[in-house]
């Protein structure tokens, strides 16, 4: 069955706007779980712009579903991950100038270093995922460094979908879906788990959820935005419904 990992970074973004104690990401994680989330994702950035170290510690203690820690492949972050031992650590590129992650990790350019990072995480019992663009070379490099999961960056697909007026049949959208599909097939052929995420929302999620090889989608901003009007539990529940409808409930 296709799974939903809910990214709650922007609950912390709202809290940090006032440098106060609410809204509480740990409470958000519990609400997401009650809405049907299969996992919780947070990105502990080097600049600590939203999620803080204490948030990750509390989530590790309180979350009853799997915890996915997005992180840069730095010694500091690897040390934090190894100490807290989330179920999964997803290696992502990171730039202080960016509003959000803008592209996939270039695994090809840093295979040696990333292989060492993956080995350190594996020694701590942590599954490593890499966030990559839908490119065969990056998929193959991910397999070589020992990653067990690849998350394909769906930002280009989401931008094409929006530019096409939400028409899933437009040539540009079909082309982007095909890129994601082919990357997913390569991921599975190499024995890794195929996840996807970035800029997915209630309008564009179904064509991606319909791909037969995809196992998990990570979605954050759209769900947190919808929760302002419906509550987080219902926002998660509706996203999960759309995903399962597209994938077929039995998958």
UniProtKB/Swiss-Prot annotation:
Pathway annotation from the record: Cofactor biosynthesis; pyridoxine 5'-phosphate biosynthesis; pyridoxine 5'-phosphate from D-erythrose 4-phosphate: step 5/5
The entry's keywords: Cytoplasm, Pyridoxine biosynthesis, Transferase
Single Gene Ontology MF annotation: pyridoxine 5'-phosphate synthase activity
BP GO annotations: pyridoxine biosynthetic process
Alphabetical list of InterPro entries matching this protein: Aldolase_TIM (IPR013785), PyrdxlP_synth_PdxJ (IPR004569), Pyridoxine-5'_phos_synth (IPR036130)
Pfam families listed in its UniProt record: PdxJ
CDD domains, A to Z: PNPsynthase
Reactions that this protein is recorded to catalyse: 3-amino-2-oxopropyl phosphate + 1-deoxy-D-xylulose 5-phosphate = pyridoxine 5'-phosphate + phosphate + 2 H2O + H(+)
Highest taxon above the source species: Bacteria
Residues binding 3-amino-2-oxopropyl phosphate: 7, 18, 199, 220-221
Chief localization: cytoplasm
Feature type site, description Transition state stabilizer: 151
Residues annotated as the enzyme's active site: 43, 70, 198
Entry GO terms, CC: cytosol
Annotated SUPFAM superfamilies: Pyridoxine 5'-phosphate synthase (SSF63892)
Annotated 1-deoxy-D-xylulose 5-phosphate binding sites: 9-10, 45, 50, 100
The keyword Ubl conjugation belongs to this UniProt entry's keyword annotation: no
Enzyme Commission number(s) of this protein: 2.6.99.2
Cellular localization per UniProt: Cytoplasm
Subunit structure: Homooctamer; tetramer of dimers.
Function recorded in the entry: Catalyzes the complicated ring closure reaction between the two acyclic compounds 1-deoxy-D-xylulose-5-phosphate (DXP) and 3-amino-2-oxopropyl phosphate (1-amino-acetone-3-phosphate or AAP) to form pyridoxine 5'-phosphate (PNP) and inorganic phosphate.
Assigned protein family: Belongs to the PNP synthase family.
Protein name, UniProt field: Pyridoxine 5'-phosphate synthase
Species this protein is from: Aromatoleum aromaticum (strain DSM 19018 / LMG 30748 / EbN1)
Lineage, highest ranks first: Bacteria, Pseudomonadati, Pseudomonadota, Betaproteobacteria, Rhodocyclales
Name of the gene: pdxJ
